[in-house]
A protein has these predicted regions:
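Nucleotide/pyrophosphate-binding catalytic subdomain
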Residues: 1-269
């Protein structure tokens, strides 16, 4: 438990239907001096009720004194805006091919979503720090590969701004965008961005909230725990396909580079 807050105080803002506070007390103590990076997928947050639950949970973690960093997606919002503008896009191995028209739309949508998350947290009393390509960019990128256009791979994370925000008890809200040469904006896979940030911070946990229960084996059974080598085999054997491939690759990369553990959770479930 946070050293500066009593159990009685916690009970005042503990959400309805959340786990028993007495059960989670030990986890609060366990993580009070650790950093947690939470990536919430845009496919989950398109549902406003789920979005509101997410905002409530992040606010609670912040009030408990935990150091939480939020990285968000925005895929459905991007698709909706591209459709509205009659711009066609395609995917290669789960990554959106991004030309000049598309990157302009992606940047606009993700920054708006970043503001939406920040403003929603502010309404609950949390302090936030927004990070994207127009405000305190923290991700420098290099092009992922030519066929993907303006899709970037994180090359450098300016973690000093993240640490500053956390030290001020602010929640960093990070859009999966970065800048390359000539200040050109690049789209970044949300899981890739979250993994890069978690590695830089050496976070205790990287939590990927998605719109599925988790990762399944070749018998379609949910996997509760798995080692990096076995995850790589799931890709090799084509058990994992599509958009789950970069997610799994980022999980493996994270735990092999300083992150103590990665959890994939069904973000549609409250608390």
């Amino acid at each position: 438990m946070s050293k500066n807050i009593s159990l009685d105080e916690i009970k005042k803002f503990w959400p309805d239907k959340a786990p028993d506070i007495n059960i989670v007390q030990k986890y609060i103590k366990k993580y009070e001096n650790e950093k947690i990076v939470i990536k919430y997928g845009g496919n989950v947050l398109i549902d406003r009720n789920v979005f509101n639950n997410f905002i409530s949970d992040i606010n609670v973690l912040n009030r408990l004194g935990l150091s939480v960093v939020v990285v968000h997606g925005g895929g459905p919002r991007i698709k909706r805006e591209l459709d509205k503008r009659k711009i066609v896009s395609k995917f290669i191995n789960g990554l959106r091919v991004t030309d000049k028209n598309i990157i302009d739309t992606v940047e606009e949508v993700l920054i708006d979503f970043n503001k939406d998350i920040a403003n929603s947290l502010k309404k609950l009393g949390s302090q936030v720090a927004m990070f994207h390509t127009k405000t305190d960019n923290i991700i420098e990128v290099k092009p992922e590969r030519e066929e993907l256009g303006f899709v970037g791979m994180p090359n450098k994370i300016n973690d000093s701004l993240i640490h500053k925000a956390l030290n001020e008890n602010k929640i960093p809200i990070i859009a999966p965008l970065g800048l390359g040469k000539n200040e050109q904006a690049y789209n970044i896979n949300g899981d890739t961005a979250a993994s890069a940030i978690a590695k830089k911070l050496k976070s205790r946990r990287l939590i990927l909230m998605t719109n599925v229960e988790g990762v399944y084996d070749d018998q379609k059974k949910l996997i509760s725990e798995i080692k990096p080598f076995d995850l790589e085999n799931l890709i090799k054997w084509k058990v994992v396909q599509g958009g789950m491939i970069p997610k799994i690759e980022n999980c493996v990369d994270a735990v092999q580079n300083g992150v103590k553990g990665v959890v994939i959770l069904d973000g549609r479930k409250p608390h």
